[in-house]
From Swiss-Prot:
InterPro entries in UniProt: CFAP418 (IPR029239)
Subunit structure, interactors included: Interacts (via N-terminus) with FAM161A (via central region); the interaction is direct.
GO biological process, one term: photoreceptor cell morphogenesis
Pathological condition linked to this protein in its record: Cone-rod dystrophy 16: An inherited retinal dystrophy characterized by retinal pigment deposits visible on fundus examination, predominantly in the macular region, and initial loss of cone photoreceptors followed by rod degeneration. This leads to decreased visual acuity and sensitivity in the central visual field, followed by loss of peripheral vision. Severe loss of vision occurs earlier than in retinitis pigmentosa, due to cone photoreceptors degenerating at a higher rate than rod photoreceptors. Retinitis pigmentosa 64: A retinal dystrophy belonging to the group of pigmentary retinopathies. Retinitis pigmentosa is characterized by retinal pigment deposits visible on fundus examination and primary loss of rod photoreceptor cells followed by secondary loss of cone photoreceptors. Patients typically have night vision blindness and loss of midperipheral visual field. As their condition progresses, they lose their far peripheral visual field and eventually central vision as well.
Required for interaction with FAM161A: annotated segments: 1-75
Record's protein name: Cilia- and flagella-associated protein 418
Protein's cellular compartments: Cytoplasm; Photoreceptor inner segment
Name of the encoding gene: CFAP418
Tissues where the protein occurs: Widely expressed, with highest levels in heart and brain. Also expressed in the retina (at protein level).
Disordered: annotated segments: 26-52
Keywords: Bardet-Biedl syndrome, Ciliopathy, Cone-rod dystrophy, Cytoplasm, Disease variant, Obesity, Retinitis pigmentosa
Intrachain S-S bonds: none
One GO location term (cellular component): cytoplasm
């Protein structure tokens, strides 16, 4: 009788308490094989815990991604800086000032054989950007012409700067250059420093 009971227990144990079935948690363990605890319940609890952990990590990843996106977004309120360095700014200002033009120093008058341009101590060029500070007129010049001796202040006052009117007092002469504003006039043949003629109020208007 005892032997039959042992064989029955062995058969039950072999059927219901195999290691594969226990690992898979698919059957209920008899009390003799583990104290009556359900392996499937433990597996379900473990699966839920794993799922919660996965969801937590996913939320944390989403939060990190959101923070990174916020940090990477450009600040719309912040205007882009267009200021250059101090040195480059000074260079730009200096270039702008230089771009306004250069003045002759000294200022020369000259006949038609003297090239026009910016006069310097080593470059004798006749200034062709003259302005009179007395009448505030630009000084005109005509190559290979000279003024007639009958010219007077009223003639230039009434006819400047119309060439077709002024030519009534212009005489052809090769090598000379006729200068005039509304209040003064000169016929020049050689290079002449403007400072030597104290009656003229002409200055270089910059090139």
């Amino acid at each position: 009788m005892a032997e039959d009971l042992d064989e029955l227990l062995d058969e039950v144990e072999s059927k219901f308490c195999t290691p594969d079935l226990l690992r898979r948690g698919m059957v209920e363990q008899p009390k003799g094989c583990g104290g009556g605890t359900h392996s499937s319940d433990r597996n379900q609890a473990k699966a839920k815990e794993t799922l919660r952990s996965t969801e937590t990590f996913k939320k944390e990843d989403d939060l990190d991604s959101l923070i990174n996106e916020i940090l990477e977004e450009p600040n719309l309120d912040k205007k882009p800086s267009k200021l250059k360095s101090k040195s480059s700014g000074n260079t730009s200002v200096r270039a702008s000032i230089e771009g306004l033009g250069k003045s002759c120093s000294p200022v020369y008058l000259g006949g038609s054989s003297i090239p026009c341009g910016i006069g310097t101590n080593i470059s004798w060029r006749a200034c062709d950007h003259l302005r009179c500070i007395a009448c505030d007129f630009l000084v005109v010049s005509y190559d290979d012409y000279m003024w007639d001796k009958s010219c007077d202040y009223l003639f230039f006052r009434n006819n400047m700067p119309e060439f077709h009117k002024l030519k009534a007092k212009l005489i052809k002469k090769k090598g000379t250059r006729a200068y005039a504003c509304q209040c003064s006039w000169r016929t020049i043949e050689e290079v002449t420093d403007l400072q030597t003629d104290h009656q003229l109020r002409w200055v270089c208007g910059k090139h």
